[in-house]
């Protein structure tokens, strides 16, 4: 089922973990509508601007979220979030997603630059992936960096230099 010109329902619900563990990761009718809005309002404009985007994680059922050690309260479980990467000519360049999001002035709830070379004091120029979410109402336009502290715990902080990575 096509959700937008370049995104399908399968792409936003695919999970090797769910398949391997026999977990049902099928969205509800309401979920399909929300994923369609996510695809048309946020993902497709980004795709139009930067080219091919690789969705590495989209909708997660609460059971799948638990199986991978994530929160059942995650925006992924509410049909509002994807993790994605941008690869061009075999080279990952995920910061392009962030740059396009800001340049296009798209509405979004959260943009998290996940790990890569991020630290407590340094914004990543090479995040491993981008977590991006969109809600029907009350989007926060929150930009965060995820990094590991000295105890290998995941921490989040605001992006230090919002427009100048």
Named regions from a protein language model:
Residues 54-56, 81-85, 131:
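Structural recognition of the beta-strand scaffold that forms the well-ordered cores
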Residues 38-42, 64, 80, 93, ...:
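Amphipathic alpha-helical interface surfaces
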Residues 86-165:
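Catalytic cores and adjacent binding grooves of peptidoglycan-active enzymes
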Residues 43-68:
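Extended, low-complexity, intrinsically disordered C-terminal regulatory tails
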Residues 1-47, 148-165:
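Extracytoplasmic cell-surface/polysaccharide-interacting catalytic and binding patches
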Residues 62-82:
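Short, surface-exposed glycine/acidic/tryptophan-bearing loops
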